[in-house]
Amino acid sequence: MLCYDKRVETLVIRDLGRLDYREAWGVQLETHAAVAAGDAPPTLLLVEHPPAITFGKKGGRSNLLANEDFLASQGFSLYDIERGGDVTYHGPGQLVGYPILPIGRKVRNYLRNLEAVMVNVLAEYGLKSEGSPGYAGVWVGDEKVVAIGVAIKRNVSFHGFAMNVHTDLEHFTYIVPCGLADKSVTSLSKLTGQRVSLEEVKPKLVRAFRDVFGVQDVQHIEDEKKQEVLL
């Protein structure tokens, strides 16, 4: 199931480890410019962020439930960014992926493919999950386990997905996640009843990404920016 016409010969997996949101954002923009110019192959950035709250194009401070000074005192950073969607949280224990791919104008197909990747990963843990019509992301029952929010510029994608692996779910109480007051969030560890590490999930994610997007060759790069990942 491909989201663009030309089959990907090579996908670079660049693991940034644990990295500040602003710095990772800069890496995204640099990589996006290179891919869009044809100077770099399609790339999937993997990263874990310190606590951060981001507001997409539909995001508003009305969905922020905690005082900004309080959040700053707790080590949270806040960012207004160019992805679609509303407000979301990033933090330790969450596996974030930024696929930077030439998708053309097939945005809807691309989003469905991202959902399919996540569904395949969760299935390896015996979990039945699905996308929900009208709501971006992947759900197990009525609980969201993966948030998805993307941006497209020059027909190349950036931003992406955030899978709650062993995330501190209390941090989501500081926001109305994705602006959906009647929905809740969960994590892979909570759903399975055991602590799952990011390092365990990563190869499953890469395999699912390869299968869904029809990638021919995967190249892994250990990034010089990479810091120790929280397990």
Feature locations, PLM:
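C-terminal accessory segment of soluble enzyme catalytic cores
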Residues: 170-231
